[in-house]
Amino acid sequence: MKRLLIVDDEPAIARLIQKIAKGCGYEVTVTHDADQFMDALVAGEPDAIALDLSLPSIDGVELLRFLAAARCRAKILIISGFDARVLETSGRLGEARGLNIAGTLMKPVRAAELRAAFEALDAAVPA
């Protein structure tokens, strides 16, 4: 089964991502802060990551640096309330560091957008 690791400090958003991902066949681990996220990543690398750029204890760019240093191979979906320019720049930064940035979504995110994003990931993530 495909594994998704979510890091989002907004429980309602994390639940929505989890629900849609499960419906798309993912086994999901939800984390709400950077420490939980890093612990879950060390426990076993997922096939995909849903990453919020705005966390209380660390920003998403620092998490992208951490993922690059860890040589993470997961497909990364960046989801944030920042504007499109910030999302695009973050995606390019991740790619420049060797990460597999699968896409970006701006909050508030709709279920249909999430479903489409996970279906696109399915084409590249083996079951």
Enumerate the language-model features and the residues they cover.
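Conserved acidic carboxylate
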Residues: 8
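Short hydrophobic/Thr-rich beta-strand motif most characteristic of the beta2 strand and flanking loop
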Residues: 25-33, 40, 105
